[in-house]
A protein has these predicted regions:
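Gly/Ala-rich beta-loop-alpha elbow adjacent to hydrolase catalytic centers
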Residues: 40-45, 49
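Active-site nucleophile elbow and catalytic-triad environment of alpha/beta-hydrolase enzymes
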Residues: 137, 141-163
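Short beta-strand/loop motif that positions the catalytic acidic residue
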Residues: 173-175
Length: 207
């Protein structure tokens, strides 16, 4: 409402977003009883969906994870520390060029020479241009969002948390094989294997 984008909350933003997802699930269940409910999450939304599957097992009929991944634990820990320090310096809704450059900027460096700052998003140049022209898409996110997301990535990587998922909930993974969020496919395979190791019986992967 204050015109600033890319910030969840001063504290516990990740859990608050997952609570919103659960609230919407309950609302839709009341409006449409008996209708199968599938949860789709893309990119950061896939991380939130994975958190939801841990915190609210057995409450959806299936999950679709698009463009997911899992960065190495030391890198995630460093990202959380850096974003947290920048949060103290700039405030929870502040924007850090350093954090942005080390995160999303690193994705684009894989596609040099670059035509735009968002070449990594798609092979389709028209879609990249449309993204950059949309003020609701091309803004830089807050340091607290990065801090919260790094904490979320730590949470969804822990074996004891993965073990809380409903093993019978079908999960479909799909991603571009050149998507840096998924480590050019390697991170997607890693998460797929993590779900299998956690006992999930119905997981499918498409690159």
């Amino acid at each position: 409402q204050d015109g600033r984008y890319g910030a969840f909350a001063p504290q516990n933003g990740w859990k608050l977003v997952v609570a919103d997802i659960a609230r919407l699930r309950r609302i839709q269940g009341e409006k449409h009883p008996g209708v199968p409910y599938f949860l789709l999450g893309h990119s950061m939304g896939s991380f939130l969906t994975r958190t939801y599957l841990i915190d609210h097992p057995g409450t959806v009929d299936g999950a679709i994870l698009s463009g997911t991944g899992q960065e190495p634990a030391p890198l995630v820990a460093f990202g959380k520390l850096l974003a947290g320090l920048e949060c103290r310096r700039l405030g929870y809704d502040g924007v850090s060029p350093l954090v942005d450059r080390l995160s999303l900027g690193a994705y684009n460096r894989r596609f040099r020479p670059n035509r735009t700052s968002a070449d990594w998003l798609s092979r389709d140049e028209e879609q990249v241009d449309a993204y950059l022209a949309d003020p609701l898409c091309s803004h830089k996110s807050s340091v607290s969002m990065f801090r919260d997301m790094m904490g979320g990535l730590q949470y969804i990587a822990r074996r004891e948390n993965l073990a809380r998922m409903d093993p019978d909930t079908p999960v479909y993974f799909f991603s571009g094989d050149q998507d840096p969020v998924g480590g050019m496919g390697k991170g997607v395979h890693k998460v797929y294997a993590m779900f299998q190791a956690a006992g999930c019986r119905d997981v499918t992967l498409k690159l």
